[in-house]
């Protein structure tokens, strides 16, 4: 399918990408919502369910830098954005129709690859479409839209299953197909290189210290956030909350993170990227410690959940922009590192803390999350700063396709 030739740049096209991001990420949390139903329908055990979640996480996170590097290669790769969101929706719809565990695994693999296709190239397109002076603000709109989508998917799926049943899951693919068409028609123009692209190995070799620093900070932040989001509802239930109330608490954490992303991006354009990242992370630590100190689910616990979500996830947006400005000649690859690989690494690190929670209870997990936030802020001081004007110099080798 040939893409429209008209150039699409500027902030107007960011709206299309933001809504597509919201739609794409709304499918990410549908699997946890479907698991109880799939366990009964297909006779899947808990261990097998855990492997399925790992399959999705691995395919969606660890392949993003590779797809991002391919999108930096100078060819017309905008197709990755619209095909990625379409594949995510179709795969999520197939989960409810899958007749056996093998079909579920194939659907999850396809959904993970759809997410991996969409994220790095779309983030690079947005970064290239907006003025540098307001890049933090517009990237925060784009990324926060995805964060707003996370709690929407399970809610919509719950209503759909309660009304129609699993057989009606095909309906959830419709928004993805509509947004895929809009991205194809109205999304930002692809970026084409006028200089020869570097190989994956050359990019890594030339930015080894920068990549190590950015991934370390991003993965540590993702670990802290994943600890809170994973154990927050479990801790609430252990303290007498209903499953519904625990889910609401998780939704509050996620939505607060989306709001924090918008605020963080706006502040970063005015106060500086590193300053906002460090202050946000240091400020998040006391609220993580407050979660650990609460024996009841009173107002203090709810406030701590909301503020920790806002600060932990607010810094995520600014970290993504910092990465893009540190490696402007590899926007797709660095977006894959910051939005995919780092989150995947952080998620994998949750398993050891689950063992700690089984032996010592869940408060130490929240203490660990706060400590990781402090460590992350300290690591940020070690990340090399990009040379002044680096983005503008590298951009001379790029042009709209």
Residue ranges and their predicted role:
Residues 29, 57-65, 151, 254-262, ...:
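Residue-level signature of mid-helix packing/kink "hotspots" within the transmembrane helices
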Residues 79-93, 275-289:
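Structural signature of the two symmetry-related core transmembrane helices
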Residues 63-76, 261-272, 357-358:
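Helix-to-loop junctions at the C-terminal end of transmembrane segments
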Residues 107-145:
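Cytoplasmic helix-loop-helix junction between adjacent transmembrane helices
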Residues 43, 75, 97-102, 272, ...:
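Helix-breaking motifs and short loop linkers at transmembrane-helix boundaries and internal kinks
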């Amino acid at each position: 399918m040939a893409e429209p030739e008209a150039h699409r740049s500027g902030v107007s096209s960011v709206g299309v990408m933001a809504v597509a991001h919201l739609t794409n990420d709304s499918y990410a949390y549908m699997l946890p919502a479907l698991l109880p139903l799939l366990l009964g329908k297909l006779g899947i055990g808990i261990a097998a369910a855990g492997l399925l979640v790992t399959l999705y996480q691995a395919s969606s996170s660890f392949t993003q830098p590779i797809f991002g590097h391919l999108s930096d290669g100078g060819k017309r790769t905008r197709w990755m954005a619209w095909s990625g969101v379409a594949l995510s929706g179709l795969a999520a719809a197939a989960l409810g129709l899958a007749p056996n565990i093998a079909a579920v695994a194939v659907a999850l693999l396809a959904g993970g690859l759809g997410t991996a296709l969409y994220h790095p190239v779309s983030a690079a397109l947005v970064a290239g479409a907006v003025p540098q002076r307001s890049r933090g603000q517009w990237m925060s709109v784009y990324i926060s839209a995805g964060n707003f989508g996370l709690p929407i998917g399970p809610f919509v799926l719950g209503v759909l299953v309660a009304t129609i049943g699993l057989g009606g899951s095909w309906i959830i693919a419709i928004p993805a197909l509509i947004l895929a068409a809009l991205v194809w028609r109205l999304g930002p123009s692809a970026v084409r290189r006028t200089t020869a692209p570097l190989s994956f190995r050359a990019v890594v070799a030339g930015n080894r210290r920068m990549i190590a620093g950015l991934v370390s900070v991003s993965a540590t932040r993702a670990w802290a956030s994943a600890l809170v989001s994973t154990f927050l509802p479990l801790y609430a239930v252990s303290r007498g909350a209903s499953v519904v109330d625990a889910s609401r608490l998780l939704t509050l954490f996620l939505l607060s993170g989306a709001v924090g992303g918008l605020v963080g991006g706006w502040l970063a354009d005015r106060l500086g990227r590193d300053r906002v990242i460090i202050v946000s992370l240091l400020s998040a630590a006391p609220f993580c410690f407050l979660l650990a100190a609460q024996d009841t689910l009173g107002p203090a616990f709810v406030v701590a959940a909301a503020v920790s979500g806002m600060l932990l996830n607010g810094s995520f947006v600014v970290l993504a922009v910092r990465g893009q400005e540190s490696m402007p000649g590899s926007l797709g690859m660095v977006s894959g590192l910051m939005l995919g690989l780092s989150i995947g690494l952080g998620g994998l690190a949750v398993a050891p803390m689950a063992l700690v929670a089984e032996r010592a209870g869940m408060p130490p997990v929240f203490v660990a999350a706060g400590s990781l936030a402090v460590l992350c802020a300290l690591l940020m001081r070690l990340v090399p700063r990009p040379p002044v004007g680096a983005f503008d110099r590298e951009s001379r080798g790029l042009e709209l396709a």
